[in-house]
């Protein structure tokens, strides 16, 4: 039986996404609307994490932290909109780290609750948060170039680089015992004769391949290269989620 903790996955996604929201907006080069977009999205995901946890399997610290992430994102959103209405274009980027810090506490609780080797569980949860957050924000930033065409490509390069740097950590975390290798050897039954283990491997290899191709696309001079890179990042989101969720779902069963 495949089992996946939806509340933890949604909280990971929200925390990782907000961490890379700060990463991109910290130099105040991106328009305020990009921050509004990301805070709104991750506010909803954190609320869904809290609701899923309360409805399915309560981990008290995780659910309280998810609610805190909602409030942290909402506070940042309100402050940014209020400053804009007063004619102040700058936003204090440090506010975006508040929901990240609160959410990190919830992720620790979720990792401990998952059981197994605590160090491996923590590594998987935080690597997954960074992995999913980086690839999602990269795709969203690619779209933002339609709104703000003069934005330096360097910002998108940095997010794609971040996906590339987090990728080996994510892959190693999933290979550590008890990990994907156990699916390949048959020690862990995926219910499909090891097929899901090979599907995970295909997702992992394809993800880093898409990172390389996206970097190559961004080196082209034409503006359409950014849109091509964004399309590739759509595919990378699918394979990145396969890399993180397939392994965790099978190993948690």
Where are these regions (language model features)?
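Hydrophobic cores of alpha-helical transmembrane segments in multi-pass integral membrane proteins
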Residues: 2-86, 91-111, 125-144, 161-184, ...
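Membrane-interface segments at transmembrane helix junctions and kinks
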Residues: 115, 120, 187-199
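Membrane-interface interhelical connector segments
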Residues: 144, 148-153, 183-190
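Basic (Lys/Arg-enriched) interaction patch that binds polyanionic ligands
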Residues: 157
């Amino acid at each position: 039986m495949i089992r996946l903790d939806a509340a933890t996955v949604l909280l990971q996604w929200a925390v990782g996404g907000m961490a890379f929201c700060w990463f991109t907006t910290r130099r105040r080069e991106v328009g305020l609307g990009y921050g509004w977009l990301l805070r709104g999205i991750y506010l909803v995901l954190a609320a869904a994490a809290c609701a899923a946890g309360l409805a399915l399997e309560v981990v008290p610290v995780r659910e309280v932290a998810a609610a805190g992430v909602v409030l942290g994102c909402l506070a940042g959103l309100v402050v940014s909109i209020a400053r804009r209405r007063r004619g102040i274009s700058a936003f204090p980027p440090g506010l975006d780290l508040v929901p990240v810090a609160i959410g990190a506490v919830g992720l620790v609780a979720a990792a401990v609750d998952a059981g197994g080797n605590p160090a491996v569980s923590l590594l998987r949860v935080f690597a997954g948060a960074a992995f999913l957050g980086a690839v999602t924000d990269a795709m969203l930033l690619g779209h933002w170039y339609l709104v703000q065409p003069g934005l330096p490509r360097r910002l998108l390069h940095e997010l794609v680089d971040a996906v590339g740097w987090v990728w080996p950590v994510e892959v190693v975390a999933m290979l550590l015992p008890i990990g994907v290798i156990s699916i390949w050897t048959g020690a862990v039954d995926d219910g499909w004769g090891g097929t899901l283990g090979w599907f995970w491997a295909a997702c992992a290899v394809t993800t880093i391949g898409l990172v390389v191709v996206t970097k190559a696309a961004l080196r082209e001079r034409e503006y359409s290269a950014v849109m091509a890179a964004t399309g590739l990042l759509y595919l990378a989101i699918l394979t990145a989620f396969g890399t993180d969720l397939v392994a965790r779902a099978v190993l948690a069963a």
